Amino acid sequence: MPSSPSRSILRGLTVSEICKFIPQSWKQLPRPISETSKTHDDESVPQVLFNSFRHCISHGQLYEAFRTFSLLRYQSGSHEFVLYSSASLLSTCVGFNEFVPGQQLHAHCISSGLEFDSVLVPKLVTFYSAFNLLDEAQTITENSEILHPLPWNVLIGSYIRNKRFQESVSVYKRMMSKGIRADEFTYPSVIKACAALLDFAYGRVVHGSIEVSSHRCNLYVCNALISMYKRFGKVDVARRLFDRMSERDAVSWNAIINCYTSEEKLGEAFKLLDRMYLSGVEASIVTWNTIAGGCLEAGNYIGALNCVVGMRNCNVRIGSVAMINGLKACSHIGALKWGKVFHCLVIRSCSFSHDIDNVRNSLITMYSRCSDLRHAFIVFQQVEANSLSTWNSIISGFAYNERSEETSFLLKEMLLSGFHPNHITLASILPLFARVGNLQHGKEFHCYILRRQSYKDCLILWNSLVDMYAKSGEIIAAKRVFDSMRKRDKVTYTSLIDGYGRLGKGEVALAWFKDMDRSGIKPDHVTMVAVLSACSHSNLVREGHWLFTKMEHVFGIRLRLEHYSCMVDLYCRAGYLDKARDIFHTIPYEPSSAMCATLLKACLIHGNTNIGEWAADKLLLETKPEHLGHYMLLADMYAVTGSWSKLVTVKTLLSDLGVQKAHEFALMETDSELDGENNKPMNDDSVINQEQSSDEERLVEVG
């Protein structure tokens, strides 16, 4: 009798050998009543036993069902009773995760000659697939002479569930070679496998087969095709499929909306959402989460926030995924007010209990990114049993706000609580040492990482080390870490390129960018910001212009506001003020105040009052800056051009901001002020040790 699921299937054995696997209880039952002695009442015995068997199966009484089956197979002369009973028992064994009885039953089926019956084969394939014995399941499928696609569908689906996508495609090809026609259940599975493998060529082959079949307009097949072409980035093909569909469900709409959000075409995604409502299909929480997630991925944080707020206004239940999306959006744009609204929803609702840890961690991150460390720590304190991820969230929050003393204190507290830092903890701390200029501590953590074998291939950690050294100006150390890495990704290269760019070594940065391309690593929008910034700092106008113009067509990266800002800085540093102004005319976004201030300062340096006054008006009237340095630049430009009425307006605004005297409109010298960076005011007292007694400070206690 087999003892473990690892035993191979019973094949290639003699009947006598197979009988060894059949339980003795099945062999010791009395022989069936002879035909000559049967009465009219005796003829109903098999039916009574079969009904009893079905009762045991329906009530989950597996072993009682097996005992009844033993009686049934000896008392019944009907082949179908035994066949369908065996099929039911195999399904029940799967439901109860009982491998040994199921394998014993398979042995009985082999000895009875039922192994390749069309009813039993799909059940056997399902049984072995459920125990991850996929090779055995495939052997049964291929040895059967059944021309129905059902067992093949089960096998393909099992390979996909086990992430063995290549094998699932191979099974499909084998199925086709046997002349078995795929059905509406086969195609969605193999399409999913092609998408997972990014096998565009064979995906098109499967699509071609569908086009000449009767399943061309099947709802589930079309939905799978749309998702596949989304994976391939072929939004236009997906849209044509969607438009020709005579029937659409919520999955269809979600799939096509997801296509546009993944390509950062959010305007079209919102149009489709409106069409979805007009067509009578109600947008589910999946639809909203798809759009919000796409907005986050595209960097459209205001759009993501609007999605979550829209869910609330449309009375759509906000689940944990939507709440986390909303809190992430608030974190990125500093929307503390909305973050507190979401916090109140968390307090009042019980729908987040199953994922409360992730929601709380997102709350801590949101408050930290909005520089409200007091409330971040309140949320942290109210967690009854802190997990490692919760410790990581609060430590990362204080590190982000450059509170080195509190970060060190929290790290010690975490160690005292019995938690050891993992790669996420260390990756969140390392950037702090570059920002506060405490590279010695960073080197100590570098040694800590080197001493632990478990961090040897942790890419995120080594990327953080490269970034720490690069941002500290220690480019040789950054390069040394880079060279020691066995695996690199776009983050690794981006950190190194940014480091060389900061030091004014634009040619070297471009050389590493080319090396990245040769290595087959595709850059993203952050990489392009680093490269353009390197060109700007090294006055590489021609190279920067080429990269900017070819970004979408050559690298497949959509131009973002940051890229336009880099080009304005590049042209301004080189004195090409006309080209810098042209950027404002072509940009599809609302220009930032930092971009206007960059052009304004360049005009003051180069004495171009014409473009300077235009930039000043744009800065004052359209972008409405909140940074003091920008107002000082405005005042200087209006003083130079003699625009006294506008100068008075600026002085009034400065007065409203509480500035009494500002060096008589002196130019601001620091780059950080020109770039519009927010200097976060830090309280000298430790946030951790502050009293938290007021009602406002205890937001988490408010209903």
From Swiss-Prot:
One of its GO terms (molecular function) is RNA binding. Keywords: Repeat. Residues 595-671 are annotated as: Type E motif. Pfam families: PPR, PPR_2. One of its GO terms (biological process) is RNA modification. Residues 671-703 are annotated as: Disordered. PPR repeats lie at residues 82-116, 117-147, 148-182, 183-217, 218-248, 249-283, 284-318, 319-353, 356-386, 387-421, 422-452, 458-488, 489-523, 524-554, 560-594. Belongs to the PPR family. PCMP-E subfamily. This is Pentatricopeptide repeat-containing protein At1g22830. It comes from Arabidopsis thaliana (Mouse-ear cress). The gene is PCMP-E24.
